[in-house]
């Protein structure tokens, strides 16, 4: 029979560490869930470690700044692991080449700053789709635009067998209302 867990404190003593999804568990994209934050603070007071995980394309430091804006205090977690940092490791080790066509918003340029855990990161050059070896996507150019705006770029990339690195596998993001996100954009390529 399945045991229903009503609160973290019922089971937390069984674990040395928690890996907790951010979006929908700790915050809703606008504000923190107070009960979740309080539960994590209490868990840490009792010696537990908390790693917040997210498929945000942002580097850890960017997510930590965003968390403060959502009223998620640093005292409720030890560190943050992001898909953005994982994708940056892949990019700076050459997975998609050195000449990159970038799909994303200008605010995501921090993605292209070398990550400290890579000793000798390759030099990345952002180029047009015609001159690219690979495509890196942190999100649509415009989150409110129809995903088909990138269709021609995807078709060109497919025709040249370019590698595609998607830093955020979300199809949609819910911030009070649904809006397009990364994989919705790459799904446009699947339809081709």
Predicted regions and their residues:
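Active-site phosphate-binding/coordination module
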Residues: 44-122
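Structural motif
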Residues: 19-21, 134-139, 165
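Glycine- and acidic-residue-enriched helix-capping/strand-helix junction motifs
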Residues: 174-183
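Short, well-ordered secondary-structure micro-motifs within conserved domains or adaptor modules
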Residues: 126-146
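Single conserved hydrophobic/aromatic residue that forms the stacking wall/gate
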Residues: 184-187, 191-192
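Non-catalytic pre-domain segments flanking phosphatase-related domains
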Residues: 1-20
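Short acidic low-complexity segments
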Residues: 5-11, 118-133
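Short, acidic loop-to-helix structural element flanking the phosphoryl-transfer center
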Residues: 5-8, 26-52, 59-64, 81-89, ...
């Amino acid at each position: 029979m399945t045991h229903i867990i009503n609160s973290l404190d019922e089971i937390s003593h069984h674990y040395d560490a928690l890996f907790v999804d951010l979006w929908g568990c700790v915050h809703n994209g606008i504000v923190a869930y107070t009960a979740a934050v309080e539960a994590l603070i209490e868990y840490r007071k009792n010696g537990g470690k908390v790693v917040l995980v997210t498929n945000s394309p942002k580097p850890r430091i960017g997510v930590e700044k965003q968390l403060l804006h959502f009223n998620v205090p640093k005292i409720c977690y030890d560190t943050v692991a992001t898909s953005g940092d994982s994708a940056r490791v892949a990019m700076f080790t050459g997975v998609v080449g050195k000449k990159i066509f970038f799909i994303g918003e200008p605010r995501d340029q921090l993605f292209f700053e070398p990550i400290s855990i890579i000793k000798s990161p390759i030099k990345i050059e952002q180029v047009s789709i015609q001159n690219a070896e690979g495509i890196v996507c942190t999100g649509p150019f415009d989150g409110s635009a129809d995903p088909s705006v990138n269709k021609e770029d995807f078709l060109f990339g497919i025709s040249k067998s370019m590698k595609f690195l998607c830093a955020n596998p979300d199809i949609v993001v819910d911030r009070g209302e649904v809006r397009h996100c990364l994989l919705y954009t790459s799904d446009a390529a699947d339809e081709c």
